[in-house]
A protein has these predicted regions:
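Exposed, flexible binding/inhibitory loops of compact, secreted disulfide-stabilized domains
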Residues: 1-72
Length: 72
């Protein structure tokens, strides 16, 4: 079993900024992150406040365009 990092690698998802968030894009990022959790956040996406350092969060605007990324 692979050893997993304690925090996400944002470099993996940096290319998504400016793109429309789609289920396919989320799966693509998840695959690039070796199965690490990935989710969209923003006005169109309900989300919880739980903190998961390995998770990549793609924060979107009202048009579902990714405007920033962060771990958590």
């Amino acid at each position: 079993m692979p050893v997993l990092p304690d925090q996400c690698d944002l470099a993996i998802a940096r290319y998504t900024i400016g793109q429309k968030c789609t289920p396919e894009l989320l799966e693509e990022v998840r695959a690039l992150a070796n199965g690490a959790p990935v989710r969209a956040t923003g006005p169109k996406y309900p989300s919880s406040w739980d903190l998961r350092p390995r998770r990549i969060n793609l924060h979107t605007d009202a048009n579902r365009i990714i405007v920033s990324i962060h771990c958590g």
